[in-house]
Swiss-Prot record:
Gene name of the encoded protein: MSI3
Keyword Chaperone attributed: yes
Sequence ranges of Low complexity compositional bias: 661-672
BP terms from Gene Ontology: maintenance of unfolded protein involved in ERAD pathway; protein folding
Protein's recorded name: Heat shock protein homolog SSE1
GO MF terms, alphabetically ordered: adenyl-nucleotide exchange factor activity; ATP binding; ATP hydrolysis activity; ATP-dependent protein folding chaperone; peptide binding
Record carries keyword Magnesium: no
Subunit structure, as described in the record: Interacts with CGR1.
Lineage of producing organism: Eukaryota, Fungi, Dikarya, Ascomycota, Saccharomycotina
Keywords linked to the UniProt accession: ATP-binding, Chaperone, Cytoplasm, Nucleotide-binding, Stress response
Misc remark: Has antigenic properties. Elicits a specific immune response in systemic candidiasis human patients undergoing malignant hematological disorders.
Family in the record: Belongs to the heat shock protein 70 family.
């Protein structure tokens, strides 16, 4: 069975948590960091994922993809695409699969195009591997968090990415909701049992800013209202700082860093560092060596100047807070706590502005970087049959109004608003339609465009329901359809079946207070009831990838994983050969000199020289098999000599051990002899004393 694990997919860094050892633990990566850069890079031999992509990013800027969560499920013609383009260093194009975004990169020396879903899947595959190596267990079930403003299309794309990576997305959860669940679970001892505590959760991340108002008590949570600014985050602060210095350097040094992607990226990296320094200091230097054209740049910025630069951003902080409170139907005075998370909440100006808007002190009792991941891991554990967890019920906030439409027949309506904005989910509604058959279609749509991000497609999904057969002599039959806004926020039709009227007898119960004659016959009445007749066939066309395309992506990802593994194994074999050459050469004239004949030394020295020359010339970029063959050729002689040396060393150790044992035995024998001698002396002394006393006694009788 899979170890339950949760993933907080951050735009800049990702945090993994797993449920084990009766608790929730953060999973560290290969360099022992508690978060992993959300990056995918491509090279001429293999891919770079996470930490390795970060290490290569500056030199491989044109083939490194970041901001993964911003483009997954995003249509290429969406207005947000134009906003996102400036944050990417690779060309973004329209893909032919679903009209979404693809990235163009150079991989294995050829040009490739990968969809945003594929790119996210590559990264999630790396996350899976990290969790697998750290936990040493089976990893398949995942709870993945996404921004609360994600539409159905984006949520489906995230779920598809999980499947391509070989993961089972047991639940897709809104990010702030996951943190709120963690709050409710891990602070259960501090929560009231009978009445709800009102808590505002504020998440200021790398690329977006979200606010949710929750009602929480022991064992239960409801999200009452939620709002967001999807273009407000740490990267916007970094960009503002970078643009400030780009303008300054153009005037001061006569260089334009916008002309060189690598140069502008270095300015962005330095801007992020400066932002962090100014969170703890009032002034910070800004220096970059040879930023471009061999020009060194130098400047500085004060915290006051930074706040002036980002004032337009700070002025937007109030809107999501006010909207979330309004949607929740409560006032600031009714809030019991304001919990703040997200890396960008550490910026002093952001903290100050949030506190001023609420008019209350902020609480930082949740781990700002890990709260979402831990909440996800708990939610995933709830779906696991192998892990026992404390019961906790939670319901999320439906962000957008959804209606279901069908072809009108007779006098009935042709649509129904089923899941309004502000409703809680998961939620189920059952509708009854009279259909003539043999099939009909139902479509789900967003019906209030003003609630949606501008430019969002209204269509969600379409279902064809077939197998409808009216009763003989009737033109239509009642059809019951179960509509569902499921735990992952997907809008679905769970089931459909026809029903027919049947007359059944129902016992007539005596009225309250009426005397009952126990000998009287029971009285029945005939009533009409709807009884299930036949299950109907449901075919769905949703934003999820069709099975054939999903399978093709799964196979492509598996192929790239094998390619990466081969490159990794080849590099390991190359390093093994190199280390062996240096080890033998260093020891052949020292430790091993007495264990090899002159002929063996001469032969091995020649082989070592040839192997080294080959390794740094023709063998610089060779195959795994050739590295193994070269190693085995050297080892066939070297290991014999090494074996003689080790045998002699073992013999010396054995002789030393025997000598030590003999010395210890002799010392023990000497000690025991001394003890016996001392014992004899004591006995002799004791016997002499007794004799003397006897001789000195005088009989007084």
């Amino acid at each position: 069975m899979s170890i339950p694990f949760g993933v907080d997919l951050g735009n800049n860094n990702t945090v993994i948590a797993c449920a084990k050892n009766r608790g929730i633990d953060i999973v560290v990566n290969e360099v022992s960091n508690r978060s992993t850069p959300s990056l995918v890079g491509f090279g001429h031999k293999s891919r770079y994922l996470g930490e390795s992509a970060k290490n290569q990013q500056t030199s491989n800027i044109k083939n490194t993809v970041d901001n993964l969560k911003r483009i997954v499920g995003l249509p290429h013609d969406h207005p947000d695409f134009e906003i996102e383009k400036k944050f990417f260093t690779i060309p973004l194009i329209k893909n032919e699969v679903d009209g979404g975004v693809s990235g163009k990169v150079k991989y294995l020396t050829k040009n490739h195009e990968f969809t945003a879903t594929q790119l996210l899947a590559m990264y999630l595959d790396k996350i899976k591997d990290t969790a697998l190596k750290e936990t040493k267990g089976n990893i398949s079930d995942i709870c993945l968090s996404v921004p609360g403003w994600y539409t159905e299309k984006q949520r489906r794309a995230a779920a598809d990415a999980c499947k391509i990576a070989g993961l089972n997305p047991v639940r897709i959860v809104n990010e702030v909701t996951a943190a709120a669940v963690g709050y409710g679970v891990f602070k259960a001892g501090e929560l009231p049992e009978d009445e709800y505590k009102k808590v505002a959760f504020v998440d200021v991340g790398h690329s977006s800013y979200q606010v949710s108002i929750a009602a929480v008590k022991k064992g239960e949570l409801k999200i009452l209202g939620s709002a967001y600014d999807k273009h407000f985050g740490g990267r916007n602060f970094d960009f503002a700082i970078a643009e400030h210095f780009a303008k300054e350097f153009k005037s001061k040094y006569k260089i334009d860093v916008h002309e060189n992607p690598k140069a502008f990226y270095r300015v962005l990296v330095a801007a992020e560092k400066l932002k962090k320094v100014l969170s703890a200091n009032t002034q910070a230097p800004f220096n970059i060596e040879s930023v471009m054209n061999d020009v060194d740049v130098s400047s500085s910025l004060t915290r006051e100047e930074l706040e002036e630069l980002v004032q337009p951003l700070l002025d937007r902080i109030n809107v999501p807070i006010e909207t979330a409170l309004k949607d929740a139907g409560i006032t600031v005075d009714e809030l019991d706590s304001i919990e703040v998370i997200g890396g960008s909440s550490r910026i002093p100006a952001v903290k100050t502005r949030i506190s001023e808007i609420f008019g209350k002190p902020l609480s930082f009792t949740l781990n700002q970087d890990e709260a979402i991941a831990k909440g996800n891991a708990y939610i995933c554990a709830c779906h696991s049959p192998t892990v026992r967890v404390r019961p906790f019920k939670f319901e999320d906030y439906n962000q957008y109004t959804v209606s279901y439409f069908w072809d009108k027949e007779d006098e009935e309506d042709d649509h129904l608003e089923v899941f309004p904005k502000g409703g809680l989910f998961p939620s189920t509604k059952i509708i009854t339609l009279f259909r003539k058959g043999p099939s009909f279609e139902i479509e789900a749509k967003y019906t209030k465009p003003e609630e949606l991000p501008k430019g969002t497609e209204l269509h969600i999904a379409k279902w064809k329901i077939s197998g409808v057969v009216p009763n003989e002599g009737e033109s239509s039959i009642a059809t019951k359809i179960k509509l569902r806004n499921d735990p992952s926020g997907f809008y679905t039709i769970e089931s459909a079946h026809t029903v027919e009227e049947q007359i059944v007898k129902e016992l007539i119960e005596p009225a309250e207070g009426e005397e009952v004659d126990e000998d009287a016959e029971p009285q029945y009445r005939e009533v009409k009831k709807l009884v299930k007749k036949n299950d109907l066939t449901i075919e769905c066309e949703s934003a999820a990838l069709p099975d054939a395309e999903l399978q093709a992506f799964i196979e492509k990802e598996a192929s790239m994983v094998m390619e990466d593994k081969l490159v990794f194994d080849t590099e390991e074999r190359k390093n093994q050969l190199e280390e062996y050459i240096y080890e033998l050469r260093g020891k052949l004239d020292e430790e091993y000199k007495d264990f090899a004949s002159d002929q063996e030394k001469e032969k091995l020295s020649g082989l070592l020289m040839k192997a080294e020359d080959w390794l740094y010339e023709d063998g610089e970029d060779s195959t795994k098999a050739k590295y193994i063959a070269k190693y085995e050729e050297l080892a066939s002689i070297g290991n014999v000599i090494k074996g003689r040396y080790l045998a002699k060393e073992q013999e010396k150790k054995e002789q030393y051990r025997q000598k030590q044992e003999a010395a210890q035995a002799a010392a023990m024998a000497e000690k025991m002899a001394a003890q016996r001698e001392a014992s004899k002396k004591q006995e002799s002394s004791s016997s002499g004393k007794n004799n003397k006393d006897t001789e000195g006694d005088v009989d007084m009788d």
